Amino acid sequence: MSGLTVSIRGRNGAFAIEAGFAAEGGVTALFGHSGAGKTTLLKMIAGTLRPENGRIAVGDFTLFDAQKGINLPPEKRCIGYVFQDARLFAYMSVKRNLTYARWAGHRQATRSFDEVVALLGIGHLLDRRPSTLSGGERQRVAIGRALLSDPALLLLDEPLSSLDHARRQEILPFIERLRDESHVPIVYVSHEIDEVARLADQIVLLSAGRVTASGAAADIFPLIDAESEGGGVLLEGIVSAYDERYKLAEIDLGGASFQLSDAGLKQTMHVRLRVRARDVSIARKIPEAISIRNLLPVTVTGIERGEGPNAHVFLDFRGRRLGARLTRRSVDDLGLSVGDQVVALVKAVSVDRAAIREK
């Protein structure tokens, strides 16, 4: 089995959905505002809601094909589903919840109980009941239960939405380990930009039941920024040096360097950085005697003026997209136009620490 392929049309009551995308592996984030159709699409993949036509497959394993009359029931789809709430059996210990999944999976195990427990850091919880666990612990157990059913695909439906910020930060590293070590394709539903920036390898944007864009996270993420103050772009690079005196890591972005305040990075690490448009300024030339360390040569590729005081300037940095949110007055004062060669100024501290990921 390999990646997920979806090409379907259907309805959930009066709500119509039309979706087509392919996900090769890792984490595919379904992103959109509330009511965009994320959970409806997930239910169609899981088999709890039937599309009207189209096809859904994981590699060469067909889950649904309207033309061929194939519509596997949920229990035959080899899918692990994690809900917004953990839905653990309250009368069972954590260990029994996990071993139940092994029994219910009906497939030959490819990963051991101990491996899954170690992966999610839940060994110390095995004898406890769900009612004694924190929200983050319950979700880790729920993910473990899904993984022990030996799925070909994991569906995570806003698994962190019921948790506060502290609990989210507690569980995110375990989801990253799941992504990097389990080798199970994951479809991750979220409307939280921070989670998508940190976890996603691919992004599928949904709006009013339709896929508006899909592709690699670095390519699609700037489209989110166009609609959100909190968005930005994703840049990937390698830690090329570390300054012990000033506690700054230098990231090689392929011909240009980027300095980042100490975040526990080590030399040769592959990392992903998130740069918000609101933290990018523009200069006509490299300024002298300036405290900002990250100066990137860029080309203006577009200017979008809103009705308010702000404008969004689209930039190209060595084939990668950047954005800057400026006032319209600043755009006019600088005389910016498409094709201009300018300098993007990014504060080192403006890079989202939570979005740093080791590849």
Swiss-Prot record:
<dbReference type="GO" id="GO:0015412">
    <property type="term" value="F:ABC-type molybdate transporter activity"/>
</dbReference>
<dbReference type="Pfam" id="PF03459">
    <property type="entry name" value="TOBE"/>
</dbReference>
<dbReference type="InterPro" id="IPR003439">
    <property type="entry name" value="ABC_transporter-like_ATP-bd"/>
</dbReference>
<dbReference type="InterPro" id="IPR027417">
    <property type="entry name" value="P-loop_NTPase"/>
</dbReference>
<keyword id="KW-1278">Translocase</keyword>
<keyword id="KW-0997">Cell inner membrane</keyword>
<dbReference type="InterPro" id="IPR011868">
    <property type="entry name" value="ModC_ABC_ATP-bd"/>
</dbReference>
<feature type="domain" description="ABC transporter">
    <location>
        <begin position="1"/>
        <end position="233"/>
    </location>
</feature>
<dbReference type="InterPro" id="IPR050334">
    <property type="entry name" value="Molybdenum_import_ModC"/>
</dbReference>
<comment type="function">
    <text>Part of the ABC transporter complex ModABC involved in molybdenum import. Responsible for energy coupling to the transport system.</text>
</comment>
<keyword id="KW-0547">Nucleotide-binding</keyword>
<feature type="domain" description="Mop">
    <location>
        <begin position="289"/>
        <end position="355"/>
    </location>
</feature>
<dbReference type="Pfam" id="PF00005">
    <property type="entry name" value="ABC_tran"/>
</dbReference>
<dbReference type="InterPro" id="IPR008995">
    <property type="entry name" value="Mo/tungstate-bd_C_term_dom"/>
</dbReference>
<comment type="subunit">
    <text>The complex is composed of two ATP-binding proteins (ModC), two transmembrane proteins (ModB) and a solute-binding protein (ModA).</text>
</comment>
<dbReference type="GO" id="GO:0016887">
    <property type="term" value="F:ATP hydrolysis activity"/>
</dbReference>
<comment type="similarity">
    <text>Belongs to the ABC transporter superfamily. Molybdate importer (TC 3.A.1.8) family.</text>
</comment>
<dbReference type="GO" id="GO:0005886">
    <property type="term" value="C:plasma membrane"/>
</dbReference>
<dbReference type="InterPro" id="IPR004606">
    <property type="entry name" value="Mop_domain"/>
</dbReference>
<dbReference type="InterPro" id="IPR017871">
    <property type="entry name" value="ABC_transporter-like_CS"/>
</dbReference>
<dbReference type="GO" id="GO:0005524">
    <property type="term" value="F:ATP binding"/>
</dbReference>
<dbReference type="InterPro" id="IPR003593">
    <property type="entry name" value="AAA+_ATPase"/>
</dbReference>
<keyword id="KW-0500">Molybdenum</keyword>
<keyword id="KW-0067">ATP-binding</keyword>
<keyword id="KW-0472">Membrane</keyword>
<keyword id="KW-1003">Cell membrane</keyword>
<keyword id="KW-0813">Transport</keyword>
<dbReference type="InterPro" id="IPR005116">
    <property type="entry name" value="Transp-assoc_OB_typ1"/>
</dbReference>
<feature type="binding site">
    <location>
        <begin position="32"/>
        <end position="39"/>
    </location>
    <ligand>
        <name>ATP</name>
    </ligand>
</feature>
<protein>
    <recommendedName>
        <fullName>Molybdenum import ATP-binding protein ModC</fullName>
        <ecNumber>7.3.2.5</ecNumber>
    </recommendedName>
</protein>
